[in-house]
Every structure is written in C-alpha cells, then in structure tokens.
A protein has these predicted regions:
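N-terminal export leaders
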Residues: 1-4
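Kelch-like beta-propeller repeat domains
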Residues: 13-347
Length: 347
C-alpha cells in the first residue's frame, strides 16, 4: 500500500499543546509541583549534558522514535488534540531540519517501532487513549517513502517494548486491557512470529509472572535488559532490571533502577544503559540514570532540561554520540504533549 505524504505541518504549532483543550499552548503552572529531577545514585564523574535541538513541527506524545539511516523518525502518537495520530515527522541531524513523510497507515498511539537497515517496523498500539489495542503491524521503506502491512500480532496490545537482536525483533510486554508478560520474536525475513515464555518479574526464590508495560529496553553483549515500567498503571511502577539471554532462553536480574518509574526510554551509549524521563502518580521525571553492566552499578547523570514521559521502550534515537529525545508529555497522563527536542551526550 502506497500512501501520500503527510500534510505539511502548520507553522503556528505551539511548544506544548493540550490533548483535548485547544487553549493549552504552554506548560500549565501545575507542572512545577510535579517535576522530579533527583536520584539517590551517586553522581557520575562525567554526568553528560543536554543540548537543545530544533523543535518538532507538531507537538506529540505517546509516539515512536526510531533512528533509520542517520535520520530520526517520529511516528504516530497524541497530537493536534487527538489520540489517533498518523503523524510521521523526520529530523535530519545534518541539516538540522524537519520534514513530513508518508503518513502512518493506522492512526494510533503507543506504537512500538525499530529499524533494520533502511526499513522501519512497527507493532501494535492503541486506537483510543490507552485503550482498544490493535494487532496491525507495518514496515516503512525509507528509500521509497512507502508503508506496507506485515503479519499482525497474534495478541493485540499497545505500549510494547521492541528491540533488535541478531537481525530479529523482540517484542516485550505491553498492555491489552492489563499489563502482560508476553515475549515474542518477529523474523522480518520470514514475516513470522515465534512466541517465547513470559518475561520473569522477580528472583528465582520469589518468582512471579513479569507483567510490564511502558518500560525501557536495551541490548548489551547479546542480552536484552528490560528496565523499569509498570504493572497496569503508574501507581505500580518498578525499577526492575531483568536480563534476557537468548542462548539459555532465561532471565536473570541485575541491580534495579534507583528511581522506579514508567514511560521511560533507554538506550545503550558510551558503554552504559541510560534511562531517562518517565511518570508516576503526581510526578513527571527529569531524572537521568546510567547503568554500568560491567560493575552492576547505577549513577546519576544530568537531568533532562524539561522532564517528560511518553517515551516508553526505546523511544529515543542515537545518532553519532548524541541521544535525541523529541516530544513527550510534561504532565502525568496524556493531557499535554510537547514539541520540545533535546539531545543528551557524554561529550
């Protein structure tokens, strides 16, 4: 299926916008009471820094962010007072400019996405606000600016955490009507899924099923770290750092995230897993913490300039030595989304 390019973004989109309230064009005053910037972890010798980048043309939240061939694709999400956005905004770090590409085929939110070579693969999402999960999945070819359907999920859900390992795509957790522990692998070459055993949620002496959504994922030395997230709502956040080894098809547990939260993003850069942003009851996090897999320890990094969430999974894009974080919500829930775009670097 070939789709026309998304309509050009309006030039008067504000830095922040309300999901249903068109009068919101800036961060509400209540945000100051909800910001949480600190960490109990020791401060890193090199805490890194944030650098402001050109803003998104359209404020967005609960979206997917994927690096593909050196460009940053921001796909779907809440925007322009709707929860069913088919937006596709692309940032070129070389020209420092945004453009609009072919619209996402099924407007929705909480979609998961990854890239392999010049193609982007997306999985699931919600049609309504955190409700009505769908099973549809798509592939985008950046060379032709076209979307095509691929095999759908056997179990519809949104807020999945997706990550590439050895040319295949692992889909972890998510939510249908409640959080789930599901783990499956999508093979792009065969267009097929393999369903694995559920995620683990605790230690061997205290096992329970590991239902989680809105968590961060990263690959280190051929293993997948699934960090933070929540069970059912942000009233039940966790700092769990569970590690999946594909060689044994088993889970182990490492030092937990010092600041439990959900709606985070995680990336592996500079030899560390960096986890930033997130939400909890009455809080939005600017907290930025890094995990060293060699020492099994955490340390505190420079907090985000504007705390926000809606970054679930690997919703950040690493280009060179910079982690780009476009969009996100500055208040818990989906009431406000942002056009803010900054990048973190250890340099």
């Amino acid at each position: 299926m070939t789709l026309a390019a998304a309509p050009e973004a309006a030039t008067n989109d504000p830095l922040f916008a309300g999901l249903f309230d068109r009068n919101i064009t800036s961060i509400p005053s209540t945000v100051e009471k909800q910001r949480y910037m600190t960490s109990i972890a020791p401060v890193a010798a090199n805490p890194g820094r944030w650098i402001e980048q050109p803003r998104l043309p359209i404020p967005v939240g609960e979206h997917a962010v994927i690096e593909c061939t050196g460009k940053i694709h921001v796909i779907a999400g809440y925007a322009r007072h709707r929860v069913d956005g088919g937006f596709h905004q692309v940032y070129d770090p070389k020209s420092k400019s945004w453009s609009q590409k072919a619209a996402f085929p099924l407007p929705c939110n909480h979609v998961a996405g990854v890239s392999i070579g010049p193609k982007i693969y997306t999985f699931g999402g919600f049609i309504e606000q955190n409700r009505c999960p769908h099973s549809k999945c798509f592939v985008y070819d950046s060379t032709s600016d076209t979307w095509q359907p691929i095999a759908g999920l056997a179990r519809p859900r949104g807020a999945i955490s997706a990550i590439v390992l050895d040319g295949k795509i692992h889909l972890l957790g998510g939510r249908d009507v409640r959080s789930v522990e599901w783990h499956e692998i999508y093979d792009p070459a065969a267009d097929k899924y393999t369903i694995l055993g559920g995620m683990r949620g605790s230690t061997g002496t205290q096992p329970f099923v590991g239902q989680r959504d809105h968590m961060g994922v990263a690959v280190v030395d051929g293993k997948i770290h699934a960090v933070a997230g929540r069970m059912d709502s942000y009233d039940f956040n966790t700092g769990l750092n569970a590690v999946y080894d594909p060689k044994t098809d088993g889970w182990t547990f490492r030092a937990p995230l010092p600041t439990p939260r959900s709606g985070v993003s995680a990336v592996f850069i500079g030899g560390k897993i960096v986890v930033f942003g997130g939400e909890a009851t009455g809080r939005v996090f600017g907290t930025n913490e890094a995990y060293d897999p060699k020492t099994d320890t955490w340390e505190a990094l420079t907090p985000m300039t504007i705390p926000r969430h809606g970054l679930h999974g690997a919703t950040a894009a690493v280009v060179g030595n910079m982690v780009h974080v476009p969009g996100g919500g500055p208040l818990p829930g989906g009431s406000v989304q942002g056009a803010y775009h900054d990048a973190f670097t250890f340099s």
